[in-house]
């Protein structure tokens, strides 16, 4: 492996930073390793300062087909027939659903969030599949798993708890950690099982939602998409709208200087082009890269899975890294059918939710912990991640110090692993993470670090000089030009920290009663009821983390939102008087302010994020110091439920057990 981009050895703050105990943890009398805490903390801060200086301040490109961004914006899978070869039928189905104009329920998003909303509504008995229409810009079900089909794609959360509705569908995942194609196929399975496959309007972009106070409906406007570009506008109406755009709906593309001048192949990881690289998700032999000079920008969770394949097949690979990933072992293995039958299916009804709750207990560091760690993976051995997602101990005065001590040992082990697997010691230094483990989503992979030993791979450190601009033939980083035939943008997504509201995450303009917009509600002191509905946006429900529960297993938290929304709607329709066909729901002012106050009182649970290196979890290093006290309070109102997902779910269940719909304002109309 040839190392490049580390010429700036004069920057002794990091390149030559050596303190006792930080590169090889000492051992105590019992043989356990422990690092020199003060030395490590000093290096963490030195690295953070370098990262803050190195972080790009360029804006993000909104990838549309306008201005020549066709390759970045288009759906590469839209022209591919589904397993039944029915892609043309999908457009006919869309036309049929649009011809009905008005629908009882519109769900925006056809990923697991949208599907769970639909399934939980159906289970109330108050809704039929024919009442529901699902809109998505994709040409199929799956959400982020529809778009992401890059080589090596897998889920980092155990499939037995991540893939929803396994118990209901009777499906056994093939492996402990499922591939992207298996997960996408499971989304299609759910749609078929509940009769939702004919209720989807694919290649449909909802752009505008406006509440009609006279008719008590949502007017919906947007565009119908073809294989490549926008084709025509549409309008429809819905009594109820559920937003399920997800946290990773919009690829993030930094607007690097002169990026439009690049003449080679350029695509984002969420828009992988197998026609150029060769291979497929199911058979990722990238034979088209045998004579290609490839560069990949970014070394986050997607890149960690992609880089081993690029290293194996490309003529040369340049890995542009600013912040190294913290990579632990994955240890994937096939599902043993005998074990599955004995340990899972034989446990009776509710086995999946019990396993999910067990996983949550360990990742949120509940006390006391369950006696049995069912999942038993890297996530459940990382209690410090509770500082990011919340937990029952987070508000204790000394909790951060406790978690820092635990995390120092874990991160030291992660760094030891990098040095053990990467042959070049200079490369190993660059690939070791010097930040608290909860500051960035940890990665789990068995081939990533060893792939960087390949002779055709170069690692370019962007912390000092950075990636300054594109050229027609490549990029310039640290003052050196790298000529590349293909550049892969592994630059992530716009996420809730930078696009806080559910509407903004889906690029939807939402206007409710009295001109109230969703963006204004989120910017000026958010108040919701349980994180799923807000006043002046009636009959609008959403999933997310603001004022709701957060956890590592995203499908579990979304399912809790969906279950709660379905309960509210189901009970409201049960209570409607005879001959009333419409119900209008919104929180009372007192109800949502009380809930917001409880969220605010727990917001300090996330104080451990302060001081993290820049990344999507903290708005790419955006400081709160420049905000006024009022603005800081408004930001705190956007927090998740600080006591952890179990506490949040318990509060919702207690509320539902009362059966009073407390805090919900209901209007019944003929």
Swiss-Prot record:
Pathway: Secondary metabolite biosynthesis; terpenoid biosynthesis. The record marks 441 as: Transition state stabilizer. It is an enzyme of class 1 (oxidoreductase). One of its GO terms (molecular function) is monooxygenase activity. FAD binds at residues 144-147, 156-157, 162. It comes from the Eukaryota. Belongs to the FAD-binding monooxygenase family. This is FAD-binding monooxygenase ausC. It comes from Aspergillus calidoustus. The gene is ausC.
